[in-house]
């Protein structure tokens, strides 16, 4: 807790810790630089437990994926979550935790329930984001905290603006959508033969179908067109942060950035996800 004096008035300010999970794309190294904490998400590879960016690197993960390993995700254990909060509360007065969307994982709802045991000192924000939009929420929270806003004020802003974001996604192969049960083997086979590429959208809680086109070039154009429409119509007159996320290689996101230069867009970041 610290005090600031303005116009003779003493303002008491709580020390606020910002925390998120590794679904934000923020690495442990970057978290250290930002002065925040990132909860590593657990996953199983051939029934062996790993923690993202702790016991397995991204490069190793994609190598195992290419080897057709059996991979499944899980949520952090309540004990791990509470232990990290308790550690932070030894140094800070309050914690703002920004996990992935409750519509995509039960880990958010679990965290909300666990926070009730901390007498209002832990604030869990279900602002229904993941990846680059979740990352942006974290960056916004850091900026608001550094401006002197209270934890309640920061949470109010994040919740009020939670739906003011979109993610557009495409994939170069249908293999993993089939393997994860999101499409049937028959649909995957037909899509592969016809070179169909799905464009998906995360707008709020869940992952939904947005479009279906032929070829990865058309898929990327569809995403850029959708973003341009959002900027001109949905977010007209507002400052918009853009980010390109990628897997395995940065080449794809770099090409998307080059394709958007004619639109005079300025990209804020391009983390892997």
Regions found by a protein language model. Name each.
Residues 17-75:
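N-terminal glycine-rich anion-binding loop in soluble enzyme alpha/beta folds
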Residues 49-117, 122:
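Class I S-adenosyl-L-methionine
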Residues 4-6, 88, 268:
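Enriched - but not universal
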Residues 1-12:
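Short, Lys/Arg-enriched N-terminal segments with co-localized hydrophobic residues
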Residues 12-18, 89-91:
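Long, low-complexity, intrinsically disordered polar/charged segments
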Residues 10, 23-37, 42, 94, ...:
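Mixed-charge interfacial surface used for oligomerization/domain docking
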Residues 4-6, 23-25, 82-83:
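A generic local structural motif
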